[in-house]
Amino acid sequence: MKGKKTVLIILDGWGHGDKTKSDAIHHSSTLFVDSLYKNYPNCELKTFGEHVGLPKGQMGNSEVGHLNIGAGRIVYQDLAKINIACEDNSIAEMENLKTSFAYAMQNNKALHLIGLVSDGGIHSHQNHLYKLCELADKAGIKKVFVHAFTDGRDCDPKSGKGFIKQLEQNLFGAKIASICGRYYAMDRDKRWERVKLAYDLLTSGIGESSQNLTESIQNSYNNGITDEFIKPIISVDENKNPIATIQEDDAVICFNFRTDRCREITTVLTQTNMPDFGMNTLNLNYTTMTNYDSSYQKVNVIYNKANIKNTLGEVLEQNNKSQIRIAETEKYPHVTFFFSGGREIEFAGEKRLMVNSPKVATYDLQPQMSAPEVTATIVAELEKGETDFVCLNFANPDMVGHTGDYNAIVKAVETVDNCTKQVVEAGLKNDYAFIIIADHGNADFVINENGTPNTAHSTNMVPCFALNSGFNNIKNGKLGDIAPTILKIMEVETPTDMTGEILIK
């Protein structure tokens, strides 16, 4: 047979739940996806832990998922790598960490540690922060301040108070200078008015004054504000003055290892003046845990990413195949940068289509998001029948899953079921093969045992369907098996770098 043009649809956050009330997918009307189980070869994929290069049992996420899918192998992740480095103390030998410490010591400057404080393991891990506090203390730095971003998204919405209490036990002489919800400090959608609240807190100490941080967090909870949305809180001394703000010439380490959500705060602190928002850069000795953006000037990086060679996109380029990457804003970096193994620029023959995500405060307010527009855009492309490979992401089950709003999650799932149907029908008419998968679960586990909303990802298996592929059998696997499977359908030789298995036969 001649290789087939193939569409990969990633249903972001669509896992196999336990079919109880907590499983919003099971309680949604998903007639189309239900029909796929009956009519096409299907299997299950593992998306978490050691199956995607994370520590055992650690839930997967979109960045890790798309990296593994595009690479066609297990890609060992920063979380696992940095965990080991903290355990064996090899992090202490990292050149740019030593440089940051030496700068603070020699110039008698404050060292500010900024980032997400939780055990979510998606963007950061609190253990890495504890280690930095310990090493700064050993280095003899006297002025060490933590600016904590609270989570409530990759872990329970009211877990932040407990994480701050744990941090207070692991400061090694450092002090917590401020607290702010990730909604403001870790925006990634150019909502600069949100970022400004975090910027003003960090640089000017503008926020609610507090001498008891856990009490202030509890007050937020009492007012119906959960971790993600906690308004800026500044720690003050007995004279009501901030104990620390980030000043010109200070040292800053941003300890998030995931690259996307501390880009904006780093940009306004170090790269780009934004006079319209009253945000100007400071002259800082600024260090990040990983490389957030290779275009940054004067930002030091502790761990640079290894280049991933021979990703699916690169192999298609080598074989003169055309490809489309399409998603709405929220998942656009995932189908481009991450799917291409951390590469920003397009491959030859690659077309990128981004549909703007709706400008709403949270996606439970518009659970269909921009899926209908994404659908219309890609259907028009499939009807031309010209493109050899398409990677398409539907964001809804994940992004609405993070809100914890049950009815909205059901609407999101039903939207994606309907949109997937339209894409598949258009593709099959033009003889496309389809692989339909998820990168991790979320909407399949939305209520905790105690009845509270679960807004984090799940470690459930996810579905994988093969439509019109020319193969009738498919076996269970992992995300790193998808690229070799697609190359098999397209009759393109799999490079030896792709150690994933071919799931169809």
Predicted regions and their residues:
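Feature captures the catalytic ectodomains and active-site-proximal regions of enzymes
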Residues: 1-505
